[in-house]
């Protein structure tokens, strides 16, 4: 008996789902609103279409270059700061780059405890 109740329920649920799907589907297009065919354009329409495409492309490139300039400007602005923190970081960077020159010119080559084990030399005149 349960078998006879199942097919009408199945048919009814399929119809409900079909109707619900129709409400969300794209609107019906008429036969005359076919796909766009560029071969049917006359010369003036093709020129207008080409001009619109070129204009759109130029606007897109202008937006991209404007966005790139904004990001580049913020990067330059960050590098050109003159606050005490920035100057301290610049000085630290300069000292770390010139550290090898300072070591070779000002510090003795022998370092460690053996440097003081030999006879004392008087550096004062």
Swiss-Prot record:
The keyword Disulfide bond applies. The keyword Signal applies. Its main location: secreted. GO terms for cellular component: extracellular space. It is found in: Secreted. Residues 26-77 form a propeptide. Pfam families: Calc_CGRP_IAPP. Transmembrane segments: none annotated. GO terms for biological process: adenylate cyclase-activating G protein-coupled receptor signaling pathway; regulation of cytosolic calcium ion concentration. Gene3D superfamilies: 6.10.250.2190. InterPro entries: Calcitonin-like, Calcitonin/adrenomedullin, Calcitonin_CS, Calcitonin_gene-rel_peptide, Calcitonin_peptide-like. Disulfide bonds join 81-86. GO terms for molecular function: calcitonin receptor binding; hormone activity. Keywords: Cleavage on pair of basic residues, Disulfide bond, Receptor, Secreted, Signal. SMART domains: CALCITONIN. Residues 1-25 form the signal peptide. Belongs to the calcitonin family. PANTHER family: CALCITONIN GENE-RELATED PEPTIDE 1 (PTHR10505:SF13), CALCITONIN-RELATED (PTHR10505). Stimulates cAMP production in porcine kidney cell line LLC-PK1 via the calcitonin receptor (CT) but not via the CT-like (CL) receptor. This is Calcitonin receptor-stimulating peptide 1.
């Amino acid at each position: 008996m349960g078998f006879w109740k199942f097919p009408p329920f199945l048919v009814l649920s399929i119809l409900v789902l079909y109707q619900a799907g129709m409400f969300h589907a794209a609107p019906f297009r008429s036969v005359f609103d076919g796909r766009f065919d560029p071969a049917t354009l006359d010369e003036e329409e093709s020129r207008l279409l080409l001009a619109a495409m070129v204009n759109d492309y130029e606007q897109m490139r202008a937006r991209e270059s404007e966005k790139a300039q904004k990001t580049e400007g913020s990067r330059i602005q960050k590098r050109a700061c003159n606050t005490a923190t920035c100057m301290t970081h610049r000085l630290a960077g300069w000292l770390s780059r010139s550290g090898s020159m300072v070591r070779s010119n000002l510090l003795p080559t022998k370092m460690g405890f053996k440097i003081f084990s030999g006879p004392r030399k008087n550096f004062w005149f």
